[in-house]
Amino acid sequence: MATSQQYGSAGQVGGPSAPQPAPQQPIASGSGVSAGGLPAPANGSTSTPVSILSTSVTLTARQLAVFKPAKVFSEAVKRGKDITSLAYDAKGDYLLTAAEDDVFNLYSCKKGKLTKTFYSKKYGIDLARFTHKPDCILHASTRGDNSIRFHSLQENKYLSYFRGHESRVTSLQMSPVDDTFMSAAANESVRLWDLKSSKAFGKLRMQGHGVVAYDSSGQVIAIALNERAAIVLYDIKQFEKAPFLTIRIDDSAALSQISYPPRYPTITYIEFAPGAGNTILVGTAGGVHYLIDAFTGALRRRLVGGQGGRIGLEPEGLAAVDAYAASEKEAEEEKGNEGEGDKTEEGTEEEKKATPRSMFVPGAGISGSECCFTPDGAFIVSGSATGQIFMWQVPTDFREVDNGRNLDPVAVLHGHQGPSRCVAFNPRTAMLASAGRKLAFWLPDLDEDV
């Protein structure tokens, strides 16, 4: 799946076959080390989830069903604010968070501890991403000139700036193969950049809430066109030409049962499946996500909450967030404590200038990181307004007769406090992170029968 010629031919995959799953290996227990290297309890108790996952080991639905919060960082973000993005480095050693309080934190996945805190009070921070240098990151600004900033974690300074976007950046992705990256801004443009130059080398005008993604080869890019409920695929070497495939998401039959004319939820996230990348995950702010065939454009599955509840962060999502914030405030007031921590925080003048991404496009939701594939591509994980974590198993054999069928979750996890705005699965270990008003590290509980 490295070239555009391998896409868009109905009935033909054209790319390399998907890698065969590696033989299932037992998850180690009693080793004194938990998933991601988190220390096991000193007393030898197995009440804390313990596991080690090799990159060659495939996950199972039974393992995912027993994931539980192993550690919760209740003060990972200022009260009344949310974490808006999560990112692991390529080795899975560190987790980077960005939040509405203009703080980005670096956590050690091996130690399960906060390693370092950084501030971007002047520019704000969103969509923090590791580059191929583990000590350098990219992030979008939430105010000012809408620039993208290249930051050294080791030196704690900005190395360069990428200016040109005329509105707030809504999507930012690093190429998986080199030092180029891609960004999208609301109602403005998609741009291609290189870390070695401050000027974009590619630009495409667009409307609506921009969302972008690379395939695993870095040669094909996907752009969501919300105003057309479509995904367009480009050969990155021919970005200035027309897309080689336009995928129109036709979900009118199901959506018309909710409202007529059917109202399509805003696309907030897209991701090619790891490996062969023959499917595309289309995350939305509404009550459904989609699995799309990357070669034919067919709608394979509708990911819904089933009996587990409603997924998505909009339109009910904001109400749930507000309700959770109100409950937190009420709990603080009931404590009757005096001091700075109990006062309503109005924020600085600079903080007040920050505009949520959702304000640019109605229905865009409150995150762009609410769903993702697991590293083996076998499962999809999603947060929700209620805090529940939904997990779906990706079918291994898609049949045309089942196209557009609802896919119910194989597991629904409970334990995240407040809306789970962001989820991210560690690329190397059996560790899941979820975030919103709090940050949680999840590990499989091997006391359960897996």
Write out the residue ranges for each language-model feature.
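Hydrophobic beta-strand positions that form the internal "hydrophobic ladder"
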Residues: 95, 137-139, 181, 221, ...
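Blade/loop signatures of beta-propeller domains
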Residues: 14-68
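Inter-blade linker and blade-boundary elements of WD-repeat/beta-propeller domains
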Residues: 53-78, 113-120, 157-164, 168, ...
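Blade-level signature of beta-propeller repeat domains, shared across WD40, Kelch, NHL, RCC1
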Residues: 421-450
